[in-house]
């Protein structure tokens, strides 16, 4: 099992949690981004840079992931593709996307897009606070404990 991170939009506090977990659990974490970013020296943490462009990082993640891998993303269409390929997706607020909930989440996202396109001000998500950070860490720990077998 590997962890892939849609890194361009991933909050720094979430990356820090991922870096600590990578070393503690000895799980490979790969950040995929369209620009260089600093990562700590670790045999478990990698950075894959891709060219700039719409969904280039997303497409690379889908191409590289294997069934059973975990993808960290707030991008709901990417999460849906990951699940279709047999992977798992976790958003930075600690919500695990599953086969059971992804369709309704995708429908709500599409509805909100339609509302915004018609001029309705829907606002964006609030900044990640302590409770979301804790929810993410807890969900990540549960997932890794259940699914990762260190070699």
Curated annotation (Swiss-Prot):
PANTHER family for the chain: UPF0178 PROTEIN YAII
Matches recorded under InterPro entries: UPF0178
Record-given protein name: UPF0178 protein Spea_2958
Taxonomic superkingdom: Bacteria
Family stated for the protein in its record: Belongs to the UPF0178 family.
């Amino acid at each position: 099992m590997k962890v892939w991170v849609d890194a361009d939009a991933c909050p720094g506090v979430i990356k820090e949690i991922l870096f600590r977990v990578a070393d503690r659990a000895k799980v490979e974490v790969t950040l995929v981004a369209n620009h260089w970013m600093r990562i700590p020296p670790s045999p478990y943490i990698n950075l894959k840079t891709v060219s700039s462009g719409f969904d280039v990082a997303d497409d690379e993640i889908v191409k590289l992931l294997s069934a059973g891998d975990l993808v960290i993303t707030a991008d709901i269409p990417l999460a849906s593709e990951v699940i279709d390929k047999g992977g798992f997706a976790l958003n930075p607020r600690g919500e695990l996307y599953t086969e059971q909930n992804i369709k309704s989440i995708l429908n709500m996202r599409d509805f909100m897009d339609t509302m915004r396109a018609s001029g309705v001000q829907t606002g964006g998500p609030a900044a990640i606070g302590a409770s979301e950070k804790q929810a993410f860490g807890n969900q990540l720990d549960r997932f890794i404990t259940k699914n990762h077998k260190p070699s």
